[in-house]
Amino acid sequence: MDCFRKNNVNCAGQLPTGFKPELLYQARNHPRALQLTVYAASDAINSLGIDWEAVRQLVPPDQIGVYAGSAMGQLDYNGFGGLLQARILGKKVTSKQMPLGYAEMPGDFVNAYLLGNLGTNGTNVAACATFLYNLRHAVRDIQSGTHRVAVVGTTEAPIFPESFDGFTTMNALADDDSLRKLDNLNVDQEPNYRRACRPFAENTGFTLGEAAQFVVLFDDELTLELGANILGGINEVFIAADGHKKSITSPGLGNYISMAKAVAATRNIVGEEALKQRSNVQSHGTGTPQNRTTESHILSQIAGTFGIEKWPVSAIKSYVGHTIATSAGDQLAATLGSFAHGILPGILTIDHIADDVSQDNLDFLMAHREIGAESIDAVSYTHL
């Protein structure tokens, strides 16, 4: 018997209408996340301004690493989703659904179809911090001298019914009824879905998004030898566990530790004055009631500890939603954009800060702030 019911969550951070990555190459029934991988990784490599063959001529094959994957795996019908649904739907399981569903498959695609890489390959699965874990592998490989080049990325395409069912059952997403209550709308009025994600304001849940983000890292010597365009530098990625917790999904003490280490490391490079006067935070900013209180408290405490007053805080998820594994990549991309253009993006989906948000030492940006590229010495961004 067919069953049809209306989903109470009707907003998501989707690819632009009409953009179909599967039409840009021979997709051959690839899951959507792998289609995004091919497009995003190709874009990153071709945006170097340097032919990849020129890079390969200078770097031994075993000194190139690729760290890419997803957190949830490929769960649509061409991946694990079809593997689990086929018999129920009266169809046959294909030979591709099992292997293409694995979480490490984005990295395998980059190696096999784009780079022909013979060097290190792998991914960490770490939920919303997956991009950061992969980035940490790359940074440490380059710092140790074992690698000179690293391609880092994550891909997530979680916009399908079963995923929404899971997150909705957790009360994690901004649903229509809750959005109507926030805006005092009648039952027959449609919420403003573009304002569904409201970090640090009165909010109700996050907005699920799909995305792929890839970056290419060189060591210093190779960067100068090739004359590469330098968008930024990564000195370290800090990760800490949360200790004992009552709920596995709640934040913990590890967030304070990792953020404090990141700020201290930034101060060691740019100096105390630059940290206090010319740094900002690209926050996790999911748009959930729990996040607005816990993350704001962390940032407020860290700012006070390091003598920072009115620390500017942005939240890129107010634009693109929460892309799970790729969310930290979204934050990094936004940060590099601020470096390049001297503009800190405001949180334009909000017009006030919630009463339970810690505001001491913080300046939540509710409008774009143009400060000039030369005025940004450091960015410490957090992912909780």
Predicted regions mapped to residue ranges:
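Conserved active-site "lid/cap" helical segment
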Residues: 1-68, 134-137, 258-277
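ACP-dependent fatty acid/polyketide chain-elongation machinery
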Residues: 1-23, 221-233, 333-348
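Active-site-proximal gating segment of KS-fold condensing enzymes and close homologs
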Residues: 2-6, 32, 70-123, 163-164, ...
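Active-site-proximal alpha-helical scaffold in enzymes
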Residues: 36-50, 103, 107, 121-156, ...
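Conserved small-residue
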Residues: 41, 66, 131, 138, ...
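Acyl-CoA/ACP chain-elongation machinery
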Residues: 146-199, 203-204, 237-251, 285-292, ...
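Condensing-enzyme catalytic core mediating Claisen C-C bond formation in acyl metabolism
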Residues: 178-274, 279-280, 384
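Residue-level detector of conserved catalytic or cofactor/ligand-binding positions
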Residues: 379, 383
